[in-house]
A protein has these predicted regions:
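Topology signature of small-to-medium multi-pass alpha-helical membrane proteins
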Residues: 1-138
């Protein structure tokens, strides 16, 4: 009975996972480029500090977004490694942004709680779901 529910729920959970990861990535791109780089600066969700990236930040951001989209593509192709690409690209960009990038200006401790919440959600969506449905993912 448990396997039957697991099998039937896979398609729904799979598409919700892809929609949430893709939607968050598209929102991040919009907030970083349109509002942050081209506009007056963006705020991190849940925090009032304004982040204004420069051209180098934008270039590095776009490189890591390629890795994030590649991870989502691999998840779409049912490859577990896609979750690691997604999570790794996000984490490495976070390290860059907090040391040399736009987050360094406001300090990572000011946005630590939202970052922890986002990464917990990312781990559930990109690592735990492929692990739970390991019979479907390679």
């Amino acid at each position: 009975m448990n396997t039957d529910i697991k099998t039937r729920s896979f398609k729904f959970v799979f598409w919700i996972m892809l929609i949430l990861l893709s939607g968050d990535t598209i929102d991040t791109i919009y907030r970083f480029i349109v509002i942050g780089y081209l506009g007056e600066g963006t705020t991190f969700p849940g925090v009032d500090s304004i982040i204004k990236p420069n051209t180098i930040d934008l270039f590095i951001f776009l490189i890591f977004q390629i890795g994030i989209f590649y991870g989502i593509y691999l998840l779409y192709k049912l490859k577990k490694i896609g979750g690691y690409w997604f999570l790794g690209s996000n984490f490495i960009f976070l390290i860059y942004a907090s040391i040399l990038g736009p987050i360094a200006e406001i300090g990572i401790l000011n946005i630590l709680l939202p970052i922890i919440l986002y990464f917990c959600l990312y781990i559930i969506l990109s690592i735990c779901i492929p692990w739970f449905y390991s019979d479907k993912f390679n």
